[in-house]
Regions:
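ATP-dependent adenylate-forming carboxylate-activation enzymes
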Residues: 154-169
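Nucleotide 5′-phosphate-binding alpha/beta core
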Residues: 1-87, 93-110, 114, 118
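Adenylate-forming
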Residues: 174-182
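Short glycine-enriched loops at secondary-structure junctions
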Residues: 82, 105, 132-135, 182
Length: 182
């Protein structure tokens, strides 16, 4: 099982790596995000003063309301670079839309790849995916992409259909099930 080197570093080494990226990230946001440029200006935040993780507390927390009301202002890339639009279910209010590039989807896959790797999942495993990849459920896509990156087998069924679920379990003999309790 391959786990990238950074995942095995000490807390101090990870923090040092993260802090090395802070200036470039903040400059990128200031240049490319209408939302964060406005936040920096309205709160008199000088991004060059933010050097450590602890300094990030100078930036106001982004709320769900911000995401709902100003979603387009978060975009940092041209719209032509957006390959996937996903909207939350809106369980606790209005749905929130996330526009993702290929790089964002790669990061989503990486996050789940690491999670599955930490659970000792390998390319020899087969998972029955009993959640949807659509219908405003972002985690389904994340699980799918993470398992693909890992090289594990995937049986895509989605939720419900108990008889088909059991038939597939008997036919394909998955080593794991991915479900969400309701």
């Amino acid at each position: 099982m391959f786990i990238p080197e950074i995942e095995m570093k000490s807390v101090e080494e990870i923090k040092k790596s993260q802090e090395a990226h802070i200036p470039g990230l903040l400059e990128y946001l200031d240049k490319n995000s209408k939302y964060y440029r406005k936040v920096f200006q309205q709160n008199n935040i000088k991004i060059s003063d933010i050097k450590a993780i602890e300094d990030l507390t100078k930036i106001p927390v982004t709320t769900k309301d911000n995401l709902q009301e100003e979603s387009d202002d978060f975009l940092c890339v041209p719209r032509k670079d957006i390959v996937d639009f996903v909207t939350t279910s809106g369980t606790l209010g209005e749905p929130v839309t996330f526009a993702m590039t290929n790089k964002d989807l790669d990061r989503l896959a990486y996050n789940e790849f690491i999670s599955f790797s930490c659970a000792n999942t390998t390319e020899n495993d087969i998972f029955q995916l009993m959640v949807t990849l659509d219908k405003r459920f972002m985690a389904g896509m994340a699980y799918f992409l993470g398992l693909r990156k890992l090289g594990a087998g995937i049986i895509r069924l989605g939720p419900g259909m108990q008889e088909l679920q059991f038939e597939s379990i008997m036919k394909f003999l998955p080593t794991g099930l991915i479900t969400v309790p309701s």
